[in-house]
Amino acid sequence: MKRFILLAAIIFMGTTFINAQELGLNIGNKAPELIGKGPNGETIKLSDLQGKVVLIDFWAAWCGPCRRENPTVVANYKKYKDAKFTVGKGFTVFGVSLDDSPERWKAAIEQDELEWPNHICDFQKWNSKFRMIYQVRGIPDNYLIDENGVIIAKKLRGPALDAALHKYLREEL
């Protein structure tokens, strides 16, 4: 009986591990389209950025770790926005907020100086359709995509973002 329970536990854990690895999007997957409303009510589409290297950045104004990560994202945006990459021309950020307050969202964009023009939010917090499409389970979270919308890296925090962008540079800055 003990062997049966042990065998069942091993099979269950193995199945759970395999299923956990299959969740979310992986490197090599095409990034799903995102279409949302920007801070001024304008429609913003991820596909409009085709040709560039894009960081799809999931965050929220109420998220302390996200706000602490924002200076790193801003520094990399400023450093690489006009760079030439082997996988695209230029770099930008596509900010996807999991906020529920338009006022707090807009204030955080301004306070953290998130100067890229691509910000969307559906104000559904954890029920956000954007979070569900990308199967985001925690924030901050991100995906780096190439000029064709293919995921080339993910979960880039701190110096890992700069290292990933530098890896794809066509020429030194």
What are these language model-derived features?
Residues 51, 58-75:
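Conserved redox-active cysteine motifs that mediate thiol-disulfide chemistry
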Residues 19-48, 170-171:
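N-terminal "domain-start" segment that seeds a small globular fold
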Residues 53-54, 91, 140:
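Alpha/beta-hydrolase fold active-site loops
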Residues 139-173:
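Thiol-/selenol-based redox modules, centered on thioredoxin-like
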Residues 85-103, 116-125:
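Thiol-based oxidoreductase modules, predominantly thioredoxin-like and allied folds used
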Residues 37, 106-143:
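Short, internal strand/loop/helix patches
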Residues 68-95:
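Conserved helix-turn-beta segment immediately C-terminal to the redox Cys motif
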Residues 1-24, 172:
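Bacterial Sec-dependent N-terminal signal peptides
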